[in-house]
Curated annotation (Swiss-Prot):
It holds the Pfam family THF_DHG_CYH_C. Homodimer. Gene3D superfamilies: Leucine Dehydrogenase, chain A, domain 1 (3.40.50.10860), NAD(P)-binding Rossmann-like Domain (3.40.50.720). Pathway: One-carbon metabolism; tetrahydrofolate interconversion. Keywords: Amino-acid biosynthesis, Histidine biosynthesis, Hydrolase, Methionine biosynthesis, Multifunctional enzyme, NADP, One-carbon metabolism, Oxidoreductase, Purine biosynthesis. Belongs to the tetrahydrofolate dehydrogenase/cyclohydrolase family. This is Bifunctional protein FolD. The gene is folD. GO terms for molecular function: methenyltetrahydrofolate cyclohydrolase activity; methylenetetrahydrofolate dehydrogenase (NADP+) activity. It catalyses: (6R)-5,10-methylene-5,6,7,8-tetrahydrofolate + NADP(+) = (6R)-5,10-methenyltetrahydrofolate + NADPH; (6R)-5,10-methenyltetrahydrofolate + H2O = (6R)-10-formyltetrahydrofolate + H(+). Its EC number is 1.5.1.5, 3.5.4.9. It comes from Synechococcus sp. (strain WH7803). One of its GO terms (cellular component) is cytosol. NADP(+) binds at residues 165-167, 190, 231.
Length: 293
């Protein structure tokens, strides 16, 4: 039976640490941390995600600033909104909720966010900081995965890690974080030949491919640690990830569930980035350095 990598429980524990940091720092800072979430259009899933982030902010004591613009918004309007948030002294973190409506390019909008307020860690400068091992906001989902591994005493050093997926959102920063933790890292993608032969070499397997249950027992060596980043709705109802959990449960040493695994940690790391940005701006002491991969 695989060890359950319980992201929901860990997120709750980390929220308590963040709330303590906010309580202890508010007197010196003169205000709580602020997170602004920019949502464009009326995608139902995005609305749910934003509502969950607002609830998490409230639990920790982070002030939430929502900006909801219509899907017909022009890029110039979005850029002006981002520039206003960059200049707003109440805002320490800015998140552009993705995906954007068809016809809008996220690249120039992400580039317009102040790198020090980049709550999602997706600005080009922050990806460069990650590559060089310099301080800065970290991409939330990979940072959440690293926190989950640490919480269970799983040290990537010297291990073979395979990341399935090479997106700038998850796959590429995930590979960099594992490499920084001294793992030997291989990245698989849609052009990889004989995927199973590669993934069976993994001591740590992180799957962020965006395909429901594509990883089965034939892809995993006994005793591997498997982190499932995917989340999908089944046609018959319910949720599943990128791995077939039923097949991997008796095989893996550790497995993250869907839901309740990586998802809650992604939201928590968004708050970590925001609280750390606030702490840096106001030169506050903190004990959150272990959360930054």
């Amino acid at each position: 039976m695989a060890l359950r990598l319980d992201g929901k429980a860990l997120a709750k524990e980390l929220e308590q640490r963040l709330a303590q940091q906010v309580r202890s720092g508010c007197a010196k800072a003169g205000r709580p941390p602020g997170l602004a979430v920019l949502r464009v259009g009326d995608d139902p899933a995005s609305a749910v995600y934003v509502a969950n982030k607002e609830k998490a902010c409230a639990r920790v004591g982070v002030e939430s600033f929502g900006a909801h613009l219509p899907a017909s918004s022009q890029p110039e309007t979005l850029l002006k909104t981002i520039q206003a948030l960059n200049a707003d002294e109440r805002v320490d973190g800015i998140l552009l909720q993705l995906p954007l409506p068809a016809g809008l390019d996220e690249t120039p909008l992400l580039a317009a966010i102040d790198p020090d307020k980049d709550a999602d860690g997706l600005h080009t400068l922050n990806l460069g900081r990650l590559l060089k091992g310099e301080p800065g906001p970290r991409s939330c989902t990979p940072a959440g995965v690293m926190a989950m591994l640490r919480s269970q005493g799983i040290d990537p050093s010297g291990k073979r890690a395979v990341v399935v997926g090479r997106s700038i959102l998850v796959g590429q920063p995930m590979a960099l974080m594992l490499q920084a933790a001294n793992a030997t890292v291989m990245v698989a993608h849609s052009r990889t030949r004989d995927l199973a032969a590669l993934t069976r070499q993994a001591d740590i397997l992180v799957v962020a491919a965006g395909r429901p249950e594509m990883i089965g027992a034939e892809h995993v060596a006994p005793g591997a640690v498997v982190v499932d980043v995917g989340i999908h709705r089944r046609p018959e109802g319910g949720l599943c990830g990128d791995v077939n959990a039923a097949e991997l449960e008796p095989l893996a040493a550790a497995l993250s569930p869907v839901p309740g695994g990586v998802g809650p940690m992604t939201v928590t790391m968004l708050l970590v980035n925001t609280v750390l940005a606030w702490s840096r701006r106001h030169q506050l002491d903190h004990d959150l350095a272990d959360l930054v991969p």
